[in-house]
């Protein structure tokens, strides 16, 4: 277990992804005053190794589950993988209910009849179906069947957990810190963070990371995620520019402005590629057709982790296409259950 104190009373635990798709995840713990509650920001991967590391960290800090609050920034497997386990141990979990507005999301795995039904509708909307793309459709269905047969949940699969709904502006106080909940839309629709104005420190989940362009994970049309992401980054640059930014992946960031500039530049560059792919001829294209052109996808990945990466590519392309449509740079048409994007 690797743990260090990154600010007075705030500890960081570094966890590693055995599936290697994410690499590492950083969980943060704000230790409460004697006899008071402590806070954990996210839980890490849903693996035995991560559980052992987190339990060792809690023992080292002398924090019991019954005195532990857990703030989930968003509902992705690397951030809430242990939430169901910790809830069973009497930890109290907080999350924005907007993270569950849909039963299926392209960037996480969840079993259940409702989720499977919605998945098929989403896949159809981006141009993936048994009729149009039989090999890719079969791969999605095989993965669902494989997950259903596992005795233990796959690390990407999110187990259900009880939680208390949190709202923007709500205050969480632990130790000498008073955090208020901030909206961080973009990476997901309902992602939230924590900000202490006095100590100038903010937990910002996957909104910004140094050297990495976060995925803006569009799964459903008309959610305006990339536009909301740009608005959020602008707010962060203006209001949190002098803060210590604590992301869920990578080192804390002392000067966030250049990191934000690089992320915006990366997305503008990707949107140029997406727009070029869509308007190169007169034929409107689905999200999947555009993704193949932009990323040069020739074969359907057989490896599970590579398949997850491909899903992220589809989601990012979807975000760019929706933003281009909102800015009236491409046309969008919906027919036969599919979205098509083309020249104005």
Enumerate the language-model features and the residues they cover.
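Metallo-beta-lactamase
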Residues: 40, 45-48, 154-158, 178-271
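Histidine-centered divalent metal-coordination motifs
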Residues: 71-79, 187, 191, 249, ...
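Short Pro/Gly-enriched beta-strand edge/turn motifs at strand-loop
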Residues: 7-15, 148-155, 175-177
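C-terminal regulatory/interaction regions
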Residues: 276-344
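Divalent metal-coordination and catalytic microenvironments
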Residues: 9, 30, 42, 74, ...
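Conserved beta-strand hairpin/beta-sheet module of binuclear metal-dependent hydrolase folds
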Residues: 3-61, 108, 193-210
């Amino acid at each position: 277990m690797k743990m260090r104190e990154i600010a007075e009373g705030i500890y960081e635990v570094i966890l590693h992804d055995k599936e290697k798709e994410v690499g590492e995840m950083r969980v943060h713990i704000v230790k409460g005053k004697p006899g008071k509650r402590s806070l954990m920001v996210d839980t890490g991967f849903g693996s035995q190794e991560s559980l052992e590391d987190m339990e060792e960290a809690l023992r080292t800090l002398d924090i019991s589950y019954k005195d532990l609050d857990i703030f989930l920034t968003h509902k992705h497997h690397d951030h809430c993988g242990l939430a169901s386990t910790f809830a069973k141990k009497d930890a109290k979990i907080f999350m924005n209910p907007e993270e569950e507005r849909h039963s299926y999301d392209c960037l996480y795995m969840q079993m259940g009849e409702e989720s499977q039904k919605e998945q098929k509708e989403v896949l159809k909307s981006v141009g993936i179906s048994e009729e149009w793309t039989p090999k890719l459709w079969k791969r999605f269905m095989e993965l669902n069947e494989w997950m259903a047969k596992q005795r233990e949940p796959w690390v990407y699969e999110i187990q259900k957990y009880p939680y208390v709904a949190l709202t923007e502006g709500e205050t969480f106080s632990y130790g000498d810190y008073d955090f208020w909940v901030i909206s961080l839309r973009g990476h997901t629709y309902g992602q939230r963070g924590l900000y202490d104005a006095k100590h100038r420190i903010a937990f910002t989940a996957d909104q910004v990371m140094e050297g990495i362009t976060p995925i803006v994970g569009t799964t459903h049309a008309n959610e305006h995620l990339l536009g909301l992401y740009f608005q959020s980054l602008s707010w962060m640059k203006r209001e949190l520019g002098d803060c210590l930014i604590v992301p869920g992946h990578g080192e804390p960031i002392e000067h966030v402005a250049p990191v934000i500039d690089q992320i915006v530049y990366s997305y503008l560059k990707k949107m140029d590629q997406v727009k070029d792919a869509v308007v190169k001829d007169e034929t409107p294209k689905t999200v999947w057709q555009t993704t193949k052109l932009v990323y040069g996808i020739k074969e359907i990945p057989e490896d599970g982790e590579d398949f997850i990466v491909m899903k992220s590519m589809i989601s990012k392309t979807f975000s760019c296409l929706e933003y281009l449509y909102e800015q009236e740079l491409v046309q969008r048409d919906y027919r036969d259950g599919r979205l098509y994007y083309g020249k104005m």
